[in-house]
Amino acid sequence: EIKFKAFLDFAMQLGASKMATGHFVRTNENGDLLRGIDPNKDQSYFLYMLHQEQLRKAIFPVGGMTKTEVRRIAEENGLPVCKKKDSTGVCFIGERNFRQFLSTYLPAQPGDMVAPDGSVVGHHDGLMYYTLGQRRRLGIGGCGDGRSWFVIGKDLENNRLLVAQGEDHPMLYSTMSIGAEATWIGADPLAGGEPLRCTCKFRYRQGDQPVEVRRDGEKLLIHALTPQRAVTPGQSAVFYQGEKCLGGAIVEQILDAGQGKMDV
């Protein structure tokens, strides 16, 4: 809605028949969204909300090339971007510090960091600054058994950050989640009432995870066939069959945190 749709609508208003972007994805004659050839740069995860009509009007020239090939072509044509480092910032704020960006618009609400036994082991600067599974910048030291501390949850009602020791703590793992705002690029694969077996990415650059997806009213019930670490509400669950991106949904709720227990 913000970038792709606005750009496409503007291009059509100018009388263009197609628009081109630099995303590392591919399409076919059916208007399907396919992974980019370069597995390290594939960006289909970010475009799952598009539909076939939009994709038929889009061209992705670099989707069939690796990033190395793209840089080589840019260098051969004297384009200065050939030496530019890969961007790692959030696209709409650039390379600015993300914490500083948030603090400009959202007032911080400091609170306690709480261990599984209920003890306060530290203090946080605001829940918005932390993500499930985070280890760095917690500032917890001098307590516990010497292992690193990780964020295992957020108690929004009491403004508490829940933390525990060990990167494989059971509370970091789950297998069942609810997805909302489901978007399908083509036909709805659940329209017939049968569950969908496919693969899923719960975050960018994650390897393919086998899942079974069922309709649950207006939402999706996503069952990961292996325990998943640090699946977080607000993330996108994006579904694939081979090279084809089917669509996805926003993770709304984790149903069984701690149930997909790993050996620790």
Feature names for model-found ranges:
Residues 261-264:
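Eukaryotic N-terminal low-complexity, Ser/Thr- and Lys/Arg-rich leader segments
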